[in-house]
């Protein structure tokens, strides 16, 4: 199995000490980051968008500062960048019959991208684990 594509919720939990799953995500990352971890345009953009949103935290970063935090993390020697190199229909082919709502399409794309790279999607989202895709999802709970 290849690298872990980190869902935005994992990236945020790792970077934000006040996040409820910061410690849990940190322990998981310490065990698995040596296997390689990846981001993509979707997860990177979500990271900057959420960390710079005042609704997320009264201590939200500016977009420029959120971008600096992201860039600092991407300098890790075990980080891989996965471009959004597959189409949406190709990415969703393994789960399209299991999707129940419009809010699942990005998660399904991320899962398809991870599978395309022979990796796993690491997430805090329990709903993704219910899609029945076996070992392609690493649920951090």
Residue ranges and their predicted role:
Residues 60, 76-122:
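Active-site neighborhoods of divalent-metal-dependent phosphate/nucleic-acid chemistry enzymes
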Residues 10, 43, 87-88, 127-128:
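Alpha-helix capping/helix-boundary segments
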Residues 116, 120-141:
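Charged phosphate-binding loop/patch that engages nucleotide di/tri-phosphates or the phosphate backbone
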Residues 1-39, 51-65:
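Short, well-structured N-terminal submotif of metal-dependent ribonuclease cores
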Residues 39-44, 106:
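Short, conserved alpha-helical segments within structured domains
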Residues 38-40, 81-82, 121-123, 139:
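A structural signal for short, well-ordered beta-strand segments and their strand-loop junctions
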């Amino acid at each position: 199995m290849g690298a872990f594509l980190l869902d935005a919720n994992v990236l945020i939990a790792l970077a934000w000490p006040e996040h409820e799953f910061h410690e849990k995500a940190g322990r998981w990352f310490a065990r698995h980051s040596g296997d390689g971890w990846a981001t993509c345009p979707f997860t990177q953009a979500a990271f900057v968008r959420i960390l710079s949103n005042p609704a997320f935290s009264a201590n939200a970063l500016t977009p420029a500062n959120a971008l600096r935090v992201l860039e600092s993390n991407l300098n890790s020697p075990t980080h891989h960048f996965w471009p959004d190199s597959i189409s949406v229909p190709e990415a969703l082919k393994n789960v399209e019959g299991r999707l129940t709502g419009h809010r699942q399409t990005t998660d399904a794309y991320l899962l398809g991208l991870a599978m395309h790279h022979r990796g796993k999607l690491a997430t805090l989202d329990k709903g993704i684990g219910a899609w029945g895709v076996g070992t392609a999802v690493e649920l951090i709970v």
